[in-house]
Amino acid sequence: TVKFYKNNSLVNTSSYGNLTSEFDDEHIAFMSILFGTNTCVWNFGQDSTFAGQISAGGNADENGIGDFKYAPPSGHLALCSANLPEPTIGSNSATQADDHFNTVLYTGSGSTQSITGVGFQSDWSWFKRRDATVNHALYDSIRGGTNALRSNTNGAPAQFGDAVITFQSDGFQIAGTNVSGINGSSDSMVAWNWKASGSSVTNNDGSIASTVSANTTAGFSIVKATSPSSGTWTVGHGLGATPDFIIQKYLASNSRWTVWQNTLTSGQYLGLNESNAVASSGTPFNFTFNSTVIGGNSNYDGTSTDVIYYVFKEIDGYSKFANFTGNGNADGTFVYTGFRPSWVLIKNTARSADWRLHDVARQPTNDDGGHILLPNSTSSEVTSEYDIDFLSNGFKLRSGDVYENGDGELLIYAAFAEDPFKYANAK
């Protein structure tokens, strides 16, 4: 319902059901038609004099915010970020975004060293050397820190030289001397880190048991199970809510990574180690996703093998898993997330296109070249041509590149926050 007042008197009420089909997308636009040198001044609570045109009213909303000519009706608030709901994860909350996700940059030493500054004990850490063509390396607390998964290959977990990762209270230790690509001397490195629960439990919610480490506050869990040799099955994920984004890897060799996201249609998925467009054949999932379980399909892999899932549930002000349509030019699409992003992963679903990964640790300011890494490739960091702006409430593409802004093409993304919109400024 929309109510229109003139000089504090109600003149019209319109309910959504009475509006014409022109408003079916639930947007209402207000317009002023001006002629000649006429001007129009709007007050959304910033100035009850309307830029000195009338005497001040001095009325605030019920939260004590704003300066209105007349007192706003009960339940109606000034249109400003201060009146946004208090996020569960945010500056004035018990927990902050970087208590659950954080990026660290470091320089390899060629010998055992501890990396601090993560801010928590990570349960999933994803490493990439920035200055060389080297495999990605992914470790988690359930599988342990010896054998890395590589997002750019379909191979089984394998050790990086003699490197062993130990998760610590403020980061991780990398032990070993044959550690090129993860801690080689002078290697320029990035590590993206997520916190689960810090420990794991057996979960029997599915048709087969799973080992789960779940952080319900941040909507993230790690799930490991052993798949049957045939048929479909389910495993519990521990989040207590239906997931929005799932990364899956059968741990046997020659088993591709598969990614499902809530905006894909039933039966669709993507390959994290591939550049392929969205697929719907092969059914790596059985597409049973609910508040307790996710589904697998052994017919996809054909063997009884261990499988790992990284499972995410969207949390307002902290994480977002959605899609957008590209516009193909340097004044690119703006994507609203509800927070200032610290990490953004993008994939064009319409064509063969690399995954693109941006973060603010490698790109601390806007108009700085993009600094992309490709999860499906060993490529080193690209620091030009693919710019992105990190804004207070989302991100904006600054390139016409078809991989992440193809004109009229559908792209999915995953994003994690630096600060919620309520407390954020643009870069």
Please annotate each region the language model reported.
Residues 1-427:
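Surface-exposed molecular-recognition determinants
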